[in-house]
A protein has these predicted regions:
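Alpha-helical scaffold elements that line and support the substrate/ligand-binding pocket
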Residues: 21, 32, 107-114, 156-169, ...
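Hydrophobic alpha-helical hairpins/lids featuring a short glycine-rich hinge
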Residues: 83-141
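Terminal-appendage/accessory-domain detector
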Residues: 1-100, 196, 201-211, 218-450
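Glycine-rich, mobile lid/loop segments that gate access to catalytic sites or pores
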Residues: 115-215, 222, 227-229, 233-234
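Hydrophobic face of alpha-helices
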Residues: 25, 29, 33, 107, ...
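Short connector loops/turns at beta-strand edges and beta->alpha or beta->beta junctions
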Residues: 87, 106-108, 113, 135, ...
Length: 450
């Protein structure tokens, strides 16, 4: 085992509630509420009912954990599976920039399901979630940009992040965490090819990551051993899944740098790679008083990661695929001033003006933007107007980034809108859930989070 893996597992084993700064605990609560809304917003939307039916067919008729979208009880495994699938559909879940990881969608489903199964408290859930974020983010940074080009990091690294969160609930020691990483890492999978075909694999990725991470933890607790150097070994994850791995990232400022607090919230209901350009275009249009009809063309200056992910989507075939179309997102921004769930579902595919605007949008690699990525996601657009002017828009921190974050009032508003979208809960129930999350540290059991 390398010194960096050992440092990480020792940190995870020793992490205690009292060591976590108050702002980090508060941000964990913020992220939890944000995740809860994302999961509930998917109720009734394809392909989530497929996962629900699978859980009903293969899982128990009852259990200690709760499936959020339908309120049914099940085992921790199947609750984690369905809740993680539903977390990653509406594209409103959080993102950590430099790891390009969506931690909430894998950490919270596994941690909540296991906490309900094990009878853990709100405080224990918070500590476990922090552990999952801190480990997952560092492993994502360790694997680097080359990993993300082919592999869906939230699927691969997410398996380990989920496993760590559950392992922390089970009070694993350093050796158990090492075995746990081995068993989670050997299951890590998830490829970007699905985007070309508008396939449903993205939800399968997160469902399996959360459930497989939980599986690894429960088996480790029962004595299953795992590879001791799964991250850096000769036939480990970096060897097979990365060309630019940096082992030092695994132990980067453990205990002083709280990576969870660097996590961004999503403001638009689309792939995060579209957000910088969307914000830059919106700012430019407001500043110059432009309408969509005033714009002849838009060139978005982006990083390579955006081209790798968004470049596969030319003419989107589904609402979900439209969330990965730069032109569609900017079309909604230009025409409606926002790219939320309502705009996507009502207009992304049906409004011909969106398609017309999409044809005006192109992406080009920008050295400044690419050099800053993934630590910073810069937004740069060049607009040619119908009357021949060339205008430039720029933002350095998209809405939702730590330096331009959402307040608790904005998070509550977002949560209510997400729940209202799917009608998964009434307004009163949504308010009660918000109150429960803000009292998370007081809860001795987590049955109320259902």
């Amino acid at each position: 085992m390398s010194q960096h893996t050992r440092a990480l597992t020792e940190f995870l084993a020793g992490l205690a509630y009292e060591q976590i700064p108050e702002p980090v605990l508060a941000r964990t609560e913020d992220l939890f509420l944000d995740w809860l809304g994302s999961a509930l917003a998917s109720a009734g939307s394809h392909p989530i009912p497929l996962f629900e039916r699978y859980a009903q067919k293969m899982g128990p008729a009852d259990g200690p954990a709760r499936i959020l979208v339908n309120g049914q009880s099940s085992s921790a495994y199947f609750a984690a599976l369905v809740n993680a699938a539903s977390s990653h559909l509406v594209e409103q879940d959080d993102l950590h920039n430099s790891s390009v990881l969506h931690p909430a969608t894998v950490v919270f489903p596994a941690a909540l399901a296991a906490a309900q199964d094990l009878g853990k408290s709100g405080r224990e859930l918070l500590v476990a979630s922090v552990a999952g974020y801190e480990a997952g983010i560092r492993i994502g940074e360790f694997l680097g940009r080359s990993h993300y080009r082919i592999f869906h990091t939230t699927a691969t690294v997410g398996t380990l992040a989920a496993a760590v969160a559950v392992g922390k609930l089970m009070e694993f020691d350093q050796q158990q965490f090492t075995h746990l990483l081995g068993s989670a890492g050997t299951q890590a999978a998830g490829l970007w090819e699905f985007l070309r075909d508008a396939a449903d694999s993205k939800q399968l990725h997160t469902a399996k990551a959360a459930a497989d991470g939980l599986l690894a933890a429960y088996l480790t607790a029962d004595g299953l051993t795992g590879a001791q150097n799964i991250l850096e070994g000769e036939q480990g994850m970096a060897a097979g899944m990365s060309r630019d791995a940096e082992p030092s990232k695994l132990s980067d400022r453990l205990g002083s740098r709280w990576a969870l607090a660097e996590t961004s919230f999503k403001f638009h209901a689309s792939c995060r790679h579209t957000h910088p350009a969307a914000d830059a275009l919106l700012d430019l249009m407001q500043r110059e008083g432009l309408s969509a009809a005033d714009i002849a063309s838009v060139t978005t200056r982006v990083h390579q990661g955006a081209i790798d992910v968004l470049g596969r989507v030319t003419v989107p075939q589904t609402v979900h695929q439209a969330k990965f179309s730069m032109g569609t997102v900017l079309g909604l921004i230009a025409l409606y001033g926002k790219a939320g769930l309502t705009e996507f579902h009502n207009h992304a595919l049906s409004d011909p003006r969106v398609g017309e605007f999409r044809a005006k949008v192109s992406m080009t690699l920008d050295p400044e933007v690419d050099d800053a990525y993934p630590a910073r996601w810069l937004g740069r657009v060049e607009v040619t107007t119908a009357d021949g002017r060339t205008l430039h828009g720029a933002i350095d921190e998209p809405k939702g980034d730590p330096g331009n974050t959402l307040s608790r009032a904005e998070l509550e508003d977002k949560f209510r809108r997400l729940v209202q979208f799917s009608a998964a809960r009434s307004d009163d129930e949504a308010g009660a859930l918000i109150d429960t999350v803000w009292r998370l540290r007081e809860l001795q059991r987590l049955d109320a989070l259902a």
